[in-house]
Structures are given as C-alpha cells and as structure tokens.
C-alpha cells in the first residue's frame, strides 16, 4: 500500500449526540489523517457540535444545517457539496436518513468507491423497528444505495451474516469497532462508598433491554438481601425518544431504592463512571458492536451481556458473562455472578487483555486503511473481506 488517499467520511451527527457511533466514526478518521491521508468529514449540525468540533483532527470538517424533522437529517446543501468532491473512497456511517441519500448521489455521479457501515441497522430486530419508514426509504433510495456499494462493512460475523441474508450481492468486510485504552492502576482505587456498582451506560432505548433489567433487579433484590444491601444499579445515558420517564416510574413502582438514574455522561464524568463501577451490564436485544462493552473492558471491568451484543470473543476469553432478556433468568444471573468477587475480578483482567489484543484503534485503523487502499486500486484485497 502506497500513497496518500483522498477520503471522505459521511455521517449524521458529528457530536456526542451520535452516542457510541461518535468515537466509532471519529477515531479512525483522525488516525487516517495523522497517517498522511486527506480526510474530509461531512455531517449534520446539532446543538452539541460546538463542544465536539475541536476533537475532530481531520483535514476538512463540514457541517450542514437540517431542514425539517431532525431525525430525517435533511440537509440539501450536504448533497450538493458532496457531489462535486473527487474523493477516492467515501465511507458512509448509518442508514435511513439524508446523509445516506447524499452518499448515494456522490457514488452515482462520481463513479467512486462507496463503503457503507450500517452499525447494526440491517440486523433483523433493527429492520423491524420502524419498519414502515425503512420500507419507504428503501424503495426511494436505500436499497439501490446498498446494492451499488463497493463494500458493506460489518462489525462482526453475525452482522455479516445478517447482511448476506439480504441478498445484496456486495462484498462484505468485517472490521470491528475499537477502543481507546486508558492508563489504569494495577491495584484498584479505594472504594468511595460501601456499595458496589453495576453500571449500564448507553442510549436509553427499548432495544437496550433496560425495562427488563429493572424488572430483573427488582426480582433479584427481593431474593438476595446481599444484593439489595451491597449493590447499586446505575443507569446512565441519553434519552433517545422520551423513554426514560417510564423507566423511572417502573423503578418507583417496584420499590427500588438501590437504583440511580444518572442521565447522559460524557468526558471526565463518563470516565469516572467506568473507572468507579464494579461490573458493567448490557442486556440488549440488538447491537452492531457496542462501544460501551469495549470501553468497560478497557477499564478492566467484567461485563454481563446478551448474545445480541455480537462479541462472542468476550465469552470465549472469560471476559463476559452470558445473560438473557427474560427478567426471571436475568435475575438469577445477577444473583449468581455478582456474588463472586474473585470471578468478577478475573473477568475484568481478561477483558482488558482482550481489548489490548484485538480492539485497539491503531489495529482497527490499519484495517480501514487496507480496505480503502484496495478499493482505490492501491493494495491487495484484504483477507477480512469475506464475501
């Protein structure tokens, strides 16, 4: 692989409003720029962008105003601007909104190389959520966009299989998300209070299984006085669609006193939450590859997660405990796992080792660069292109 490439990255939000996708988009873009490539990023203006702008270390950052409903991300100036740019490769993150349509226009007009990262949006559960809107978008532009892509990037084998099942007949590259590894002490810091903390940190949305988690927590604390007295369930994250109030009501109806709703956490507050928790939980129904799990491992925390989180390496490495969404089954897992401090500590160490081995951003960016070089005619087909 030789020579600098002219790369474009297209996404919706350029700020923390993107949730886990923010770092998943920004980190490789910044690193590719640092490695000498020309990286231009195109996205949507939102209220949180001013605080995030300086963290983008790319050649060009272009933000565009939205007209109409925010969820559609209709920014016509993006499409007009993008269509005139002669990039070697364009990497689109996300589907079902105007940036996807703008990327499709670029691909059609420039005859370029389009890479699409759905980030789990083509998984069966995700396709069934808001199905009517997605069928309309598919008919209007998205189906043709997917079929015209040079490559669709999957985060894991399960996502690749879900994409392949759609019959798009497009090469699929498996490139996982990465994580920034913090410096952590070999000996954990002294506890600030007597209770241990089980942390959920992510988007507040039904697919995350938070209602089931609260129900299971209520069952578990009734059955286990030790869990009730020794553990706190902390639910942190931004509310995507006014789903938080019913969850707070549910916790009150169940009489839970060892539960805390912390709201969205960013920067140092997020780092403190990860560093200070004793275990991390993600009872999701559908994921691409959750950044939050990788971040928990980076902080040497044991993880409780469902198979839908799509990181089977965690189970194989002893870094994660398999859980289910069913409240009774999940309650049993909570009582069992959280009563084994040494096992939890071992899992946390295994998680950190797994993150160091497989999920550093340098490693993941190597794969991005190899894929783009192949598509630009400057390198061989990578072995992680599986279809």
Predicted regions and their residues:
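Glycosyltransferase donor-sugar binding loop
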Residues: 42-48, 201, 230-246, 263-264
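Conserved donor-binding/catalytic core segment of Leloir-type glycosyltransferases
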Residues: 153, 179, 190-208, 212-218, ...
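Aromatic "clamp/platform" in nucleotide-sugar-dependent glycosyltransferases that forms part
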Residues: 285
